[in-house]
Amino acid sequence: MDIGKKHVIPKSQYRRKRREFFHNEDREENLNQHQDKQNIDNTTSKKADKQIHKDSIDKHERFKNSLSSHLEQRNRDVNENKAEESKSNQDSKSAYNRDHYLTDDVSKKQNSLDSVDQDTEKSKYYEQNSEATLSTKSTDKVESTEMRKLSSDKNKVGHEEQHVLSKPSEHDKETRIDSESSRTDSDSSMQTEKIKKDSSDGNKSSNLKSEVISDKSNTVPKLSESDDEVNNQKPLTLPEEQKLKRQQSQNEQTKTYTYGDSEQNDKSNHENDLSHHIPSISDDKDNVMRENHIVDDNPDNDINTPSLSKTDDDRKLDEKIHVEDKHKQNADSSETVGYQSQSTASHRSTEKRNISINDHDKLNGQKTNTKTSANNNQKKATSKLNKGRATNNNYSDILKKFWMMYWPKLVILMGIIILIVILNAIFNNVNKNDRMNDNNDADAQKYTTTMKNANNTVKSVVTVENETSKDSSLPKDKASQDEVGSGVVYKKSGDTLYIVTNAHVVGDKENQKITFSNNKSVVGKVLGKDKWSDLAVVKATSSDSSVKEIAIGDSNNLVLGEPILVVGNPLGVDFKGTVTEGIISGLNRNVPIDFDKDNKYDMLMKAFQIDASVNPGNSGGAVVNREGKLIGVVAAKISMPNVENMSFAIPVNEVQKIVKDLETKGKIDYPDVGVKMKNIASLNSFERQAVKLPGKVKNGVVVDQVDNNGLADQSGLKKGDVITELDGKLLEDDLRFRQIIFSHKDDLKSITAKIYRDGKEKEINIKLK
């Protein structure tokens, strides 16, 4: 969000600050209004009409100005902090560089001084050893003088070291001088106490200790004065001289040892300073001063302290000095000569120990430097290697972490996947085998069911013989004697059997020979027959329990392609119980039938088509579905050259309607309208002109004759009328007219007819009763 003056902040932060600013401003304004109201109520002044508002500047402008000023102040503070941090970093770096340079310079100088001191001390040692045999006082004084000079030189070197360490940088000069002065004061105080304790030994020893204290407290320019004082001192007694020598040697050893330790500490602290960028030379010096102070507090400590390690040469030298001391003590030498030899021997041993300690410290320092540099190089190489590995192995590390976090779940998931694959393969194989077995089982079951249904149906199908009947099972078929057909037991009541068959099978004979599947025969009686439906009912009596009543199905639910079985007796008794298999080839077929064999079709039979094998003798046989239920009765087949397996069966629902009336009445009552008709398709051109038939009319019937007082006459139908539609159905010919009229045999309701009379179209209602 741009608020001006080159300040850009996020929109959410801008809205939050604006909301807080408005809230605070409204609260302040409400408080002011409340306070002004109290003042007005108390003073009852005329200031009640005073407008209590802030300036006319818009709230948003005030908020933007306030926010921009706040951001400017914050930026200034940030810049100042950055400047101070950069300055402090530069100062620390410069101070560190100076201290580091001074530390290196001091260490180099100290190494050179140590080497020079070792050479001088060795030469002096050999000279003093050669001069130790002398027993004169002059040589003893010379040796004592040289010893004092050596101690003064050591003190000078110590003061020079302290002086060099005290001026590493101008930045820390004042603080370091203060710390040194405080430490020297503490050292001087400790030395003063020691002097007071030893005051009983004589004025010479006290004067000498005060001079030593003054040497430690004085600065570098006063070293020459201390040397003069030492040279001008009076000779000391033997106990005082031994005590002084021992104290000086201890101080020198302590300085050398602490300096070596401080050098190692400086190196270790220098490594830490590289990571923190903070100089640490002053701290190392403080540690050195503290160690010196602690050691000086115990002047009586022996040289053989646990912190100092003696070499084999030192031990041999000590033993030699001890033997010489005993020898000199037992000798009849003077007290001065014994004193000088003993002081010389102790001085030599002290120098030897100092040399060995310095060598040991230098060796430790070199080892420490080598280890430090090696560690630094190793750290650098390790850091580079780690960076390279981190860059190259970042992805592998992520994968390892992911695996370590989720490996149980991943293992379980992999196991589940493998198990699913295995089970899938197993189940696929099993399912394949099951499907094969199911197919085989289905085929076996289908075959078993077919066989079962066939066996059950055979028990319900009988042979019907009529010697006087004529063959009329097919259109234009020649008449023959000794007709044999089939029948179906559709009902059984006790020993009474009701058999349905075709009307053309029973013919004109009332009695029929009924033969069962077990070759037993009985005589049956025809209860009724209907030539228009080609159905007849025969009643027979038999106590044979093998004869079964067939189960009735529903022909309204037939499906095209549905498998069926046909059971009958083709060609007579010799082939009784023949079973053929097929499917339903067609539904709602209108098959023309010639019952009286006059080469003229008499009726349209409503049937369904099957492709099962049907032969003479199958008429009246049973058509069952795969459940073994009766769905039709075989009625006819087309017997023409080049035509095969085209047979027809009457639906069982139509059969039930007919046999019910035949069983009770013996006949079927159809409505008769009392007319005779001709088909339009058979008219010639003169006949079409006579009835004034429009040219567009191609199908229908022409009324040729109307019976007086008949249903047609009562309905107003006249000769010459052309009927093209009946009961809402297209009328093709006179067979279709009879089929539509006979379909209303049960309700006998009036039906509508569309006719042409004198070339004009009109509708009339035809009565059926």
UniProtKB/Swiss-Prot annotation:
The active site is at H504 (charge relay system), D534 (charge relay system), S619 (charge relay system). Residues 1-390 are annotated as: Disordered. Residues 21-64, 71-108, 138-186, 264-296, 310-330, 348-364 have a biased composition (Basic and acidic residues). Residues 126-137, 247-262, 331-347, 365-390 have a biased composition (Polar residues). The chain crosses the membrane at residues 410-430. Residues 1-20 have a biased composition (Basic residues). Pfam families: PDZ_2, Trypsin_2. It is an enzyme of class 3 (hydrolase). Its EC number is 3.4.21.-. CDD domains: cpPDZ_BsHtra-like. Gene3D superfamilies: 2.30.42.10, Trypsin-like serine proteases. InterPro entries: Chloro_Bact_Ser_Proteases, PDZ, PDZ_sf, Peptidase_S1_PA, Peptidase_S1_PA_chymotrypsin, Peptidase_S1C. This is Serine protease HtrA-like. It comes from Staphylococcus aureus (strain COL). The lineage of its organism: Bacteria, Bacillati, Bacillota, Bacilli, Bacillales.
